Amino acid sequence: MNSLKPMLLTSLKSYNRSQFIKDVTAGIIVAIIALPLSIALALASGVGPEAGIFTAIVAGFVISALGGSSVQIAGPTAAFATIVAGIVAKDGMDGLVIATILAGIFLVLMGLCHFGSLIKFIPFTITTGFTSGIAVTIVIGQLKDFFGLTYPDGVKPIETTEKFRAVVENFSTINIDALIVGAVSLAVLIIAPYIFKRIPGSLIAVIIGILMVQFLPLKVSTIGNLYTISNSLPSFHLPAVSFEVVQNALPNAFTIAVLAAIESLLSCVVADGMINGKHRSDMELVAQGAGNIASALFGGIPATGAIARTAANIKNGGRTPIAGIVHSITLVIVLVVLMPYAGMIPMPTIAAILFIVAYNMCQWRTFVKLVKTAPKSDIIVLFASFILTVLFDLVVAIEIGMVLACLLFIKRMSEETHVNSWTYVDDDTPDVDEHLQKLPLQIRVYEISGPLFFGAASTIEHIVVKDFTTCLVLRMRSVPALDSTAMNALVDLVEVCESKGITVVFSHVNEQPMKVMEKAGFTKLVGKENFQPNISAALKRAEEVIAE
């Protein structure tokens, strides 16, 4: 049960004052980094700015306290922005709350059922494809604010394609003042990390953006122009629940759960490499579930482990969950004291921050490398996941991407299964290699290589017997697995052979195929004496058969 033990309990056993100081310092620095990001991601998700802070506070605290990683920092992430925006637009905040709670329940169940290790079975091409697709949707969604565009009344695009069309159709309404603020903010975000190692570039960009709007004659929309800002602490809210609402929320909940699991465990793996540690994936999933449930009930949005914030925590000395807890407490203080000033942040600055977030998450170098080096089947899955994410949504991308990946994998595996006949030789055959074994004319040997499953069962049809054949030997030393479809094909082969008076002998059947054969009663059908441990014994048995 150690896999379901919070890392906080383990960390406290050897905790000391020196590490506490490092954790507090790291927690405060990460909170400063998380502040502008949480606000920007909340706005990109179609909710109020305080919802992002609530998420970082509530989910961040719960996930740090219960998590299976000693350094994970959780909060709102860019991966959820387009999903959340779509849910809010269609189902409202109550729909989002229900979907997030259900996702939290799914995550808890995944952890309790020890599904943590199963996440690795999601292909890398799918995660790369939809991550790059999300980055593109974020950029397209922020073009309006970056250029200060004005849309006609009633035009509120939801889908990415609709947003792009609206940008193109209304580009003539560009606000040069907004473009100047956005361009300066973007330049600061790019240059600041090279100059200021400790101060996050997003915070510097926010301060400069506020100063530009407040002290220069620039007509630019700010958060305060579009949203009501509150510095009140998160309060408990339980939405009205009905069977129909829950049923409608299930697909979105599943997507949120899968994405939260993937991103949080990926963050844990990256963190393990940085601190030479090992996380508890099952406990991390339980914590992610509890954190998302708590976040939804206290006015937040979906949360998961954030790689950038986790890396910042590690680089600043954080080594235990105390750093994550301090990060949440610091954000509570910031919420109460500084939140009213958030209304002064220009929208183009928010857009610029999200452009950088999108760039950092798009993995374009990995994308290009896969296109150049990956097999064609993987490239198909990569582009399918990418395009479907941009044109539709993440639900469609993951579902179709997984189905496509499975089908292409089945095709690839079926191509690795071969049935080859041994070369028949006798004393009258000229130029015979010495290593070839001479066999009587009545014995025919086939060697099967690769997994025998439904995608490769048809290869058994390649086994051909002659009129003079009295014994067929099937060498299966290279068959690691057998399923019911292939088992049925073998039964058909044996029955056809028996009808022709041909005995079938099996050589070197591995453990898994043998279990399937025994369970299906196949060993009784063939006869246990016709299952031999190696080819020499099988050929000896074949000679006994033709001698009878």
Locations of regions flagged by a protein language model:
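Conserved SAM-binding loop
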Residues: 73, 506, 531
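Short acidic-hydrophobic, aromatic-tinged amphipathic segments that line or gate anion-handling sites
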Residues: 525-541
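Active-site donor-binding loop signature of nucleotide-sugar glycosyltransferases
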Residues: 231, 450, 534
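Transmembrane helical cores of multi-pass ion-transport proteins
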Residues: 1-424, 468, 489, 521-522
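Generic hydrophobic alpha-helical segments
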Residues: 84, 164-167, 460, 464, ...
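The feature marks cytosolic C-terminal regulatory regions of anion transporters and related permeases
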Residues: 360-525, 543-546
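Short secondary-structure boundary/hinge segments and terminal tails
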Residues: 290, 331, 515, 534-535
